[in-house]
Amino acid sequence: ESHNIPEDLKIIDLSMDYRIKSDDHDFIYGLPELNRRATCTAKHVANPGCFATCIQLGLLPLAKNLMLTDDISVNAITGSTGAGVKPGATSHFSWRNNNISVYKAFEHQHVPEIKQSLQQLQNSFDSDIDFIPYRGDFPRGIFATLVVKTKVALEEIVRMYEEYYAKDSFVHIVDKNIDLKQVVNTNKCLIH
């Protein structure tokens, strides 16, 4: 069914339909830490995916400094609410309780939007993102480990991250090990 949408209506789309840039639509990829100015003025915003947001926040400072020159390895575990609202065999508590499982290894639907964002900052980025997502035994949050190769000293990398996120209220660079309880039910992202 088709509906007439007023020209001046602002839309934030939560699906993945408009996350990839295309001449067929005018949606802005709505990750503020990447596209703050464009997102604030856009009429149409595509909301980023959950894993995509997490992984991009971990990689954007490296892309900005042209440091992504090799394959990237990502292991990330999500809570049950990451599966959406549609009940499925692997989203029920009785299945997830005391359980962890892999799904869509190396073929997750968020990889193209991650690559698109990294290329926005580092045009030369063309490496693989070897992403293994997991379903976890908890309701909310994502915990991710990202591995990249670099010869740059850790102190310099920390400085890059602190500089990149200096004006972002919800991304925090921390020097202690992190746990999921520090971010659950908040809009914070902790990077260690």
Report each predicted region and the residues it spans.
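C-terminal substrate-binding/catalytic lobe of Rossmann-fold NAD(P)-dependent oxidoreductases
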Residues: D70-A76, S80-H192
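N-terminal Rossmann-like NAD(P) cofactor-binding subdomain of oxidoreductases
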Residues: E1-A105, N123-S124
